[in-house]
């Protein structure tokens, strides 16, 4: 069941200008623990995250990173706008698998699919990272780095995966977009969690387990967001699949010490969900 707090609200007017409600500034957030996890967490508390989310939303600087892949949606809905506004958009397959959707460009969150699995909200394109792409797809030029397609710098390693493998909290103190190979060695980050920008190498990385009979997804070569900078989890209130994925994402983040607010959109309005 879904619950709205009713206090944190944003609306988009007919001219696509994004505004804040006066209630947001005065909204208070409980400091009680949720699911055994306190709001005072690594990377800022829930109230701070909400405040930053509102500020970024107002300036049109929010990015959404999808965890599902709907080529038709991105080809028909987002690609033309991104192409016109950013000068990118030449490869819809790549965009659909590694999506940065700027709230200020879209004017709204468009989600026509009932099987949407969820979105993570961040304040910077580079923090969206990318989680999946198929190097075997003809549309993806071999040997080119993602930075040639997208704005911003990309994380050099999968921060959450590396932390789960090492339990080294120092991992969270580095900038994953600027860390050197030597620093990653010192942090003990395993090779399998380091970014692979060369598409041919990604295929090599997946070849051995495939030959052994394992079904390997391209996510074996994933690059993830920096969780301390993620501001929230988008929930499609009309999609049970989205709600289920949102709970899964929140629980996974809580286990690592990050408690993220659920954010839903209805009729051009954004609201925090107390629970899903």
From Swiss-Prot:
Catalytic activity annotation: L-threonyl-[protein] + NAD(+) = O-(ADP-D-ribosyl)-L-threonyl-[protein] + nicotinamide + H(+)
Effect noted on mutating residue 220 to A: Abolishes the ability to modify ubiquitin in HEK293T cells
Signal peptide from the UniProt entry: none
Subcellular location: Secreted; Host cell
The EC number(s) this enzyme carries: 2.4.2.-
Top-tier EC class: transferase
UniProt keyword Isomerase, yes or no: no
Alphabetically ordered keywords of this record: Glycosyltransferase, Secreted, Transferase, Virulence
Disruption phenotype: Deletion of the gene abolishes the modifications and effects on mono-ubiquitin and polyubiquitin chains. It reduces bacterial survival in mouse livers 5-fold at 3 days postinfection and dramatically reduces bacterial survival 100-fold at 6 days postinfection.
Subunit-structure text: Interacts directly with host ubiquitin.
Role according to the record: ADP-ribosyltransferase that specifically modifies host ubiquitin on 'Thr-66' residue, which causes the shutdown of polyubiquitin synthesis and disrupts the recognition and reversal of polyubiquitin in host cells during infection. Threonine ADP-ribosylation of ubiquitin prevents the transfer of ubiquitin from ubiquitin-activating enzyme E1 to ubiquitin-conjugating enzyme E2, which inhibits subsequent ubiquitin activation and leads to the shutdown of polyubiquitin synthesis in host cells.
Protein's name in the database: NAD(+)--protein-threonine ADP-ribosyltransferase
Species the sequence originates in: Chromobacterium violaceum (strain ATCC 12472 / DSM 30191 / JCM 1249 / CCUG 213 / NBRC 12614 / NCIMB 9131 / NCTC 9757 / MK)
Classification lineage: Bacteria, Pseudomonadati, Pseudomonadota, Betaproteobacteria, Neisseriales
């Amino acid at each position: 069941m879904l619950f709205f707090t009713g206090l944190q609200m944003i609306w988009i007017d007919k001219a696509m200008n994004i505004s804040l409600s006066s209630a947001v500034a005065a909204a208070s957030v409980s400091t009680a623990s949720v699911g055994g996890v306190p709001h005072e967490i690594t990377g800022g508390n829930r109230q701070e995250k909400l405040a930053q989310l509102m500020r970024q939303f107002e300036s049109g600087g929010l990015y959404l990173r999808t965890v599902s892949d709907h080529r038709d949606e991105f080809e028909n809905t987002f690609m033309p706008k991104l192409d016109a506004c950013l000068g990118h958009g030449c490869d819809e397959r790549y965009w659909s698998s590694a999506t940065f959707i700027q709230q200020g460009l879209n004017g709204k969150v468009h989600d026509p699919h009932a099987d949407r699995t969820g979105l993570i909200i961040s304040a910077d394109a580079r923090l969206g990272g990318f989680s999946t792409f198929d190097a075997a797809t003809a549309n993806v030029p071999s040997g080119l780095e993602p930075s040639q397609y997208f704005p911003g710098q990309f994380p050099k390693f999968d921060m959450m995966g590396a932390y789960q493998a090492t339990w080294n909290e120092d991992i969270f103190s580095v900038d994953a977009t600027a860390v050197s190979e030597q620093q990653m060695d010192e942090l003990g980050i395993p090779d399998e969690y380091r970014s692979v920008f060369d598409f041919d190498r990604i295929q090599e990385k997946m070849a051995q387990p495939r030959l052994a009979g394992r079904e390997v997804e391209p996510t074996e070569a994933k690059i993830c967001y920096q969780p301390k900078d993620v501001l929230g989890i988008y929930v499609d209130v009309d999609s049970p699949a989205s709600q289920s994925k949102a709970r899964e994402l929140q629980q996974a983040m809580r286990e690592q010490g990050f408690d993220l607010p659920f954010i839903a959109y209805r009729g051009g309005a954004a609201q925090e969900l107390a629970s899903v």
